A protein has these predicted regions:
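Short, hydrophobic/proline-enriched secondary-structure or compact coil segments at domain edges
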Residues: 295-299, 397-399, 494-503
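Short, hydrophobic/aromatic-enriched beta-strand segments in well-ordered soluble domains
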Residues: 343-345, 411-418, 422-440, 463-474
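Short glycine/proline-enriched turns and hinge-like loops at secondary-structure junctions
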Residues: 209-212, 322-323, 337, 392, ...
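Extracellular polysaccharide-recognition and catalytic grooves
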Residues: 1-213, 217-219, 224, 361-417, ...
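Non-catalytic terminal regions with compositionally biased, polar/charged low complexity
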Residues: 452-463, 470-607
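Catalytic and substrate-binding regions of extracellular carbohydrate-active enzymes
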Residues: 126-129, 136-371, 459-461, 467, ...
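Short amphipathic beta-strand/extended segments with alternating polar/hydrophobic composition
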Residues: 92-96, 102-105, 196-202, 225-230, ...
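Solvent-exposed beta-strand/loop surfaces of large extracellular or lumenal domains
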Residues: 240, 353-369, 431-445, 599-606
């Protein structure tokens, strides 16, 4: 034989055309900065499991620490909680069936640390394992497990150090996390299964991806209420996968001219991250790590229709158990000639209502308008029970999950009306991605998916899709009393949006957004901003939140934030005064006083 060293070297370092070494494959698939593997979450977990098992085999049988050769592995295992929604299930983008996180890779990192005397690594991953699986280590200790000395693959029972306490799940996730190699961005305001909010945004970069543009999943009240649709009943060989589940209309996205599409599976269509707050970061334990406002602004080129699209999304936290989402989607063809832009939103549940935002009836009529007739995608013909109304009014849709305990869950959506707009209520094929998920409140396979569509005739850039979403339940009622969309004045032509969110506790949030961060925009209430996103929160006449997102000016009748170059600044009023975080130098005027912030501060700091 050639000796152990030869074979270790071959597996680790030697590659052929179709047989890659462990190193080459890891270099190809893992992002060394984020630890994320270049496939959808479902498949990424499988690869992580295999690599972690290799680590164990190398430790036990070859007495070689694989993590020294592949330092990305511990980082990759530590990054896996970033996939989690607050209900502890993974995101559903691409060909994924969401479920709980597989903890085997975490176990392997503990074993690797124990074998190689790495105390910090053992501490970190033991705390993580006890966090994800409170019973970990207990079962193995009780059983009298016989360990065969003959088997190459036998495990010894795992022994966890009793003095290492379970970590907190909040310490293993970030408020904003961006993984460019899968074009995926997540925002979250905490990890409370019932009360926290989370957005998962993705385009199509890497393997096992769909044609979905800038797609989103939205979380609320224990469930991913706005889910990704999944793969389909017949997996990759099925027509339902090829025509519907892998295509734009099954996702929460915007489809242009009825034709938006591109290659699925191994795809190379990512979005660009234009700006965000807070900055994307690896998870770390920190006080006050979840700010009351997060946002991201991403750009996507839709290749089939040659369209430019941006999506600005935000989580606004209004209390320990309350908050809402903001979604501003701009879309237009590069060369004009736009026929239509279709905004799709799918939600769990069994009932949907669609009315004008003031409560009046839209008189929805049955229609066959959403169909592949007209050389559109075949996916359109998968929608059924379609009803529509042509209206320029603001609308409100309510999606209801009838719960066994009668505490029904609702997603409330308000959308700005526009000229040449048609709104639809419809049913789509069932949400196959969640059909295997344990603990769902109804039979997912038997329930078509509630679907809202807004069709904008012509361009949807200067008339963007502007929506506010708030999850609620029968017992935890919605906190928003009204959402209106005030007119915005600007001397610069472009896409300028105003939103006013009134809440039952007396708080009112005013929001301004522009496609030009340097364009001064004015709302009738005296709010002025030059920003991608600006928010002024006012409770019973008192300022409580000021946020400037990628901007140089936010001005209200009693406060202002100014900067020479675009910055992100968050100001929050607390019992003992104002606190701030800022990405760069700026000047703040509050209560008649002026404060000069001389450098960026990422930790919440007293003004």
């Amino acid at each position: 034989g050639k000796g152990r060293g030869y074979y270790i070297d071959y597996v680790l370092n030697q590659s052929g055309i179709r047989q890659w070494s462990l190193k080459k494959l890891a270099d190809y698939g893992y992002d060394p900065h984020t630890g994320i593997w270049a496939e959808c979450p479902g498949y990424s977990g499988v690869v992580m499991n295999d690599y972690a098992n290799f680590t164990s085999l190398f430790d036990r049988n070859l007495h070689c620490d694989l993590t020294k050769e592949l330092p990305v592995l511990p980082k990759a295992v530590a990054a896996t909680p970033q996939y989690l929604f607050p209900n502890r299930m993974i995101c559903g983008f691409g060909d994924t069936h969401p479920n709980y996180l597989n903890t085997t890779p975490v176990v392997r990192m503990i074993e690797n640390a124990q074998v190689n005397g790495k105390e910090e690594q053992e501490k970190y991953f033991t705390a993580l394992l006890k966090c994800l699986d409170p019973d970990a280590g207990k079962a193995a200790a009780k059983k009298n497990v016989r360990v065969s000395i003959n088997s190459f693959f036998d495990d010894k029972p795992l022994t966890l150090k009793p003095d290492i306490r379970a970590g907190k799940i909040e310490d293993y996730v970030s408020p904003l996390f961006y993984a460019p190699n899968v074009s995926w961005l997540v925002q979250r305001n905490g990890m409370h299964p019932r009360h926290s909010l989370m957005i998962s945004l993705n385009a199509s970069e890497g393997n096992h991806m769909h044609a979905n543009g800038i797609s989103m999943e939205l979380y609320g009240k224990g469930y991913v209420l706005g889910p990704d649709a999944g793969i389909g009943l017949y997996l990759y060989s099925g027509l339902d996968y090829a025509e519907y589940y892998s295509q734009f209309p099954s996702h929460n996205t915007v489809c242009v001219d009825g034709i938006s599409s591109y290659p699925v599976m191994q795809s190379n269509h990512s979005f660009d991250l234009l700006s965000c707050f807070p900055a994307s970061s690896a998870a770390a334990a920190a006080k006050d790590k979840f700010p009351s406002v997060t946002y991201s602004d991403v750009y996507f080129r839709e290749p089939e229709s040659r369209a430019d699209q941006t999506r600005m999304m935000s989580i606004v936290t209004t209390g320990p158990e309350t908050g809402y989402y903001v979604d501003i989607f701009r879309s237009r063809k590069e060369r004009g000639g736009d026929k239509m832009h279709d905004y799709f939103y799918h939600n769990l549940g069994q009932e949907m209502t669609l009315a004008a935002a003031d409560g009046t009836d839209l008189h929805l009529q049955p229609t066959e308008e959403l169909a592949f007739a007209g050389a559109h995608l075949g996916a359109y013909s998968y929608l059924f029970d379609k009803k529509c109304a042509r209206t320029g009014k603001d609308v409100k849709a309510v999606f209801t999950i009838r719960m066994p305990d009668k505490d029904d869950i609702r997603m409330n959506m308000w959308m700005k009306g526009e000229k040449d707009r048609t709104v639809f209520s419809a049913l789509s094929p069932m949400t196959e991605g969640l059909s295997r998920t344990p603990g769902m409140p109804y039979n997912i396979k038997e329930q078509p998916t509630l679907t809202f569509v807004a069709r904008q005739k012509g361009e949807a850039w200067n008339r963007p899709f502007v929506a506010v979403y708030e999850p609620s339940t029968v017992k935890e009622t919605e906190q928003i009393s009204s959402v209106t969309f005030p007119e915005v004045e600007s001397k610069q032509p472009g896409s300028h949006v105003g939103i006013c969110v009134k809440q039952k506790n007396g708080r009112t949030d005013y929001i301004l957004s522009s496609d030009g961060a340097t364009h001064p925009c004015l709302m009738g209430n005296g709010m002025k901003a030059s920003a991608t996103y600006a928010l002024w929160g006012n409770r019973q006449g008192e300022n409580c939140t000021l946020f400037l997102g990628n901007g140089t000016l936010l001005q209200t009748p009693s406060a202002s934030v100014k900067a020479d170059v675009p910055v992100n600044v968050l100001l929050e009023k607390e019992a003992d005064g104002w606190y701030y975080t800022a990405s760069g130098t700026c000047t703040v005027t509050l209560g008649g006083k002026t404060y000069k912030i001389k450098k960026g501060v990422t930790k919440k700091t007293k003004l």
